[in-house]
């Protein structure tokens, strides 16, 4: 307006008053037009304010609110993370403490620790768009937006007035990946499969086979199976803290897992045939590892003993292993195994024993006949005193199995020159002696063979000694000469036979050098043992016994006990229930 008033004088210098009047008229018309166009609005700030937040999305996400049909917005539940490492103790019932939370809070306040309470409104937002298959966003609160400025949202009230609400929080929404990320091990496994090619023909065949199986099933059975699967899905027992974990996630994860399983089945279908052999070998190795036994010599707590796998015991050298190396472990174990497992051999041995007994009885009868003939000759011929002396000396010489011919000749010379008849009798006796010694050696050899193959009963040894005694001349066994000095040499052959035989045949006890039936039973009740392990148990005890003798006595005891036999990894284990 000032520019107009200044220009008017330059245009018309004579009429200044008229120009001023025209300017005043124009100002009045402008004010009237401005008052007619201005609108006034009343803005109310309500006393009960509603909280309004701003959702900020990135422009690259191409979010269009108009296209959203199914939207769900909820707070994230971080109760578990907030609690952290604190123990979840029950507030009531078993294991609870009265007013534990209050006492814990008071204790913390004493030390100046003020715990922050969990605020659900401070947690980030979770936005789900489009249901199960739709997108998922997480809104994180941004700070510092409303520090230097105040932002309001204007809304129309029903009475026409405008209500202003301040904006409290700004949230930046970013998309969440719906798929499950792989762990380090899974990623490595998948990386190993990167060069594998999918065989879609096998997948198609599987689908066809599944379809055929479904057709074969009755419709009623299929309905029952579906109902059972639905029930299992419907029933879910969860904590109250997990109320935010929705079913949508679980369903989507289930679908993804199914797809993965189908792919893995198709990939692993070819490798199954090759993998079976390797799996069998691994199982065998595991079985070998499982067969570690606890070593304990004490008999305490036998019922409570357990077998544990120990790797440390394998590294340390075992003292019993050294003893096993020194001993003839393999041969003995094989021999014992044959003895314990072969029932057919036992039958053969029984038959052989019976035949030996029959032979011995036949020899006895022959000897008795010979004795009768000798006694008849004696009755017919009346010998002189010198002859009697010669007979007694001859019989004394015949009683000893280990006397030489030179001693016989010396005794005969000292007693005087014998007659021819006596010499004939002495020759007959020598022949009988040779027969008896041969028969006794046969019996001993047969019994020793039986002892090697199976434990021989001590009755054989006593029978052999009885045969010897019965085979002696009738003069020595007669009751008339029992008080005479000739009766004493009759006891010598028995003792000599018993010393020549091993303890197992001479009727001696098995417990002579520490191997008792009770000890063997105790070891076998404790845990299963191989034959060599059982032998080492007794070999460790410092006993001056040869390994052959040890094996003989052990076989005898094992035959009596008759333990249970199990072959594990080619080894035979013995144990008693």
Swiss-Prot record:
Keyword field contains RNA-binding: no
Segments crossing the lipid bilayer: none
Modified residues (Phosphothreonine): 341, 457, 488
Annotated Basic residues bias: 272-285
Compositional bias (Low complexity): 392-406, 438-456
Region Disordered, annotated ranges: 1-36, 236-508
InterPro entries hit by this protein: TFIIF-alpha, TFIIF_interaction, WH-like_DNA-bd_sf, WH_DNA-bd_sf
Coiled coil: none
Alphabetized GO MF terms: DNA binding; RNA polymerase II general transcription initiation factor activity; TFIIF-class transcription factor complex binding
Post-translational changes noted in the entry: Phosphorylated on Ser and other residues by TAF1 and casein kinase II-like kinases.
Biased composition (Polar residues): 471-489, 496-506
PTM annotation (Phosphoserine): residues: 183, 246, 250, 252, 342, 352, 355, 453, 455, 482, 484
GO cellular component: nucleus; transcription factor TFIIF complex
Cellular localisation: Nucleus
Superkingdom of the source species: Eukaryota
GO biological process: positive regulation of transcription elongation by RNA polymerase II; transcription by RNA polymerase II; transcription elongation by RNA polymerase II; transcription initiation at RNA polymerase II promoter
Biased composition (Basic and acidic residues): 257-271, 319-341, 362-376, 423-437
Pfam families assigned: TFIIF_alpha
SUPFAM superfamilies: Rap30/74 interaction domains, Winged helix' DNA-binding domain
Keywords, ordered alphabetically: DNA-binding, Nucleus, Phosphoprotein, Transcription, Transcription regulation
Main location: nucleus
Acidic residues compositional bias, start-end: 240-256, 289-304
Function of the molecule: TFIIF is a general transcription initiation factor that binds to RNA polymerase II and helps to recruit it to the initiation complex in collaboration with TFIIB. It promotes transcription elongation.
UniProt similarity note: Belongs to the TFIIF alpha subunit family.
Assembly behavior: Heterodimer of an alpha and a beta subunit.
Protein name: General transcription factor IIF subunit 1
Organism: Drosophila melanogaster
Phylogenetic lineage: Eukaryota, Metazoa, Ecdysozoa, Arthropoda, Hexapoda
């Amino acid at each position: 307006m000032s520019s107009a008033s200044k220009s008017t004088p330059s245009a018309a210098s004579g009429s200044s008053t008229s120009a001023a009047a025209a300017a005043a008229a124009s100002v009045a018309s402008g004010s009237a037009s401005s008052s007619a166009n201005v609108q006034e609005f009343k803005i109310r700030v309500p006393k009960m304010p509603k909280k309004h937040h701003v959702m900020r999305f990135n422009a690259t996400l191409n979010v269009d609110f108009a296209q959203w049909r199914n939207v769900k917005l909820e707070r994230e539940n971080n109760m578990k993370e907030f609690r952290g490492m604190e123990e979840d103790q029950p507030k009531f019932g078993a294991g609870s403490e009265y007013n534990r939370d209050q006492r814990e809070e008071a204790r913390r306040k004493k030390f100046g620790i003020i715990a922050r309470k969990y605020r659900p409104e401070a947690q980030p937002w979770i936005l789900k768009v489009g249901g199960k298959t739709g997108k998922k966003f997480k809104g994180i609160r941004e700070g510092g937006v409303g520090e230097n400025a105040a932002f309001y949202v204007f809304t129309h009230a029903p009475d026409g007035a405008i209500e202003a609400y301040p904006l409290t929080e700004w949230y930046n929404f970013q998309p969440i990946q719906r798929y499950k990320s792989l762990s380090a091990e899974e990623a490595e496994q998948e990386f190993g499969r990167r060069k594998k090619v999918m065989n879609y023909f096998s997948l198609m065949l599987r689908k066809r086979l599944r379809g055929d199986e479904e057709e074969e099933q009755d419709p009623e059975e299929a309905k029952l199976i579906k109902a059972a699967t639905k029930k299992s899905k419907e029933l879910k027992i969860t904590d109250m803290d997990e109320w935010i974990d929705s079913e949508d996630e679980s369903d989507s994860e289930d679908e993804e897992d199914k797809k993965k399983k189908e792919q893995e089945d198709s990939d692993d279908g070819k490798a199954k045939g090759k993998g079976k052999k390797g799996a069998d070998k691994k199982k065998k190795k595991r079985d070998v590892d499982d067969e570690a036994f606890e070593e304990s010599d004490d008999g305490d707590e036998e019922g409570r003993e357990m077998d544990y796998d120990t790797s440390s015991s394998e590294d340390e050298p075992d003292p019993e292993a050294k003893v096993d190396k020194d001993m003839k472990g393999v041969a003995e174990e094989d021999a014992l195994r044959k003895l314990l497992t072969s029932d057919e051999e036992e039958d053969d041995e029984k038959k052989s024993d019976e035949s030996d007994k029959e032979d011995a009885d036949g020899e006895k009868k022959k000897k008795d006949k010979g004795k009768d003939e000798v006694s008849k000759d004696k009755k017919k011929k009346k010998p002189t005193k010198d002859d009697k002396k010669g007979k007694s000396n001859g019989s004394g010489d015949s009683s000893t199995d280990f006397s030489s011919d030179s001693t016989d000749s010396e005794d005969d010379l000292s007693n005087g020159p014998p007659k021819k008849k006596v010499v004939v009798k002495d020759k007959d006796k020598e022949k009988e002696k040779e027969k008896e010694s041969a028969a006794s050696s046969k019996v001993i050899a047969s019994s020793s063979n039986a002892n090697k193959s199976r434990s021989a009963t001590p009755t054989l040894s006593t029978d052999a000694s009885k045969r010897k005694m019965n085979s002696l001349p009738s003069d020595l066994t007669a009751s008339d000469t029992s008080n005479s000095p000739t009766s004493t040499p009759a006891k010598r052959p028995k003792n000599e036979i018993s010393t020549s035989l091993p303890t197992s045949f001479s009727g001696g006890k098995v417990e002579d050098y520490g191997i008792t039936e009770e000890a063997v039973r105790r070891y076998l009740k404790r845990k299963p043992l191989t034959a060599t392990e059982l032998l080492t148990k007794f070999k460790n005890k410092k006993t001056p016994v040869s390994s052959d003798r040890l094996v003989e006595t052990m076989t005898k005891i094992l035959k009596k006990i008759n333990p249970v036999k199990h072959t594990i990894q080619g080894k035979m284990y013995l144990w008693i229930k």
